[in-house]
Amino acid sequence: MYGNGPVFKAEGTSFRDQPYAEQLPQGLWTTGLCDCHEDAHICVQTAIMPCVSFAQNVEIVNRGTIPCMNAGLIHLALGFIGCSWLYAFPNRSRLREHFALPEEPCRDFLVHLFCTPCAICQESRELKNRGADPSIGWLSNVEKWSREKVTPPIVVPGMIR
């Protein structure tokens, strides 16, 4: 939708110097909450197994500190009792902090409480639009960024474990 270039800042350059910097809205989501149709693969995967899509997002947003398998199993277990949103909404908050995105259309916990599949899809699309591929995992993305001379987003202070 907004070009193919990653949004992660290359070494030694400012964000505005990037050739793709103007292609994405700064401080805005690149897709809407209900734009699931924009990526059929993510939409179908999330409809069938939301824990997989969620887990892939978690691994990227948390920079590999939470393994995909662990996040997926926790999400699945909580889903059986209808509480997966409790585990999911903090990840949305972290994603928003990484990219300075607004809390819309409402609070993160409400988005996940009432629209978990749509929220997971939107978060996956956001990561893809900003240069990360959740389906390949954190380490593979780091390798890809290294080859392309691109660095991952800077973690906001206070988010480091």
UniProtKB/Swiss-Prot annotation:
InterPro entries the UniProt entry points to: PLAC_motif_containing
Entry protein name: Protein PLANT CADMIUM RESISTANCE 12
Topology in membrane: Single-pass membrane protein
PANTHER family with a match to the protein in the record: DUF614 FAMILY PROTEIN-RELATED
NCBIfam families noted in UniProt: A_thal_Cys_rich
Organism of provenance: Arabidopsis thaliana (Mouse-ear cress)
Transmembrane segments: 71-89
Superkingdom field: Eukaryota
Compartments where found: Membrane
GO terms under cellular component: membrane
Record-stated family: Belongs to the cornifelin family.
Pfam family, one: PLAC8
UniProt keywords, alphabetically: Membrane, Transmembrane, Transmembrane helix
Protein function: May be involved in heavy metals transport.
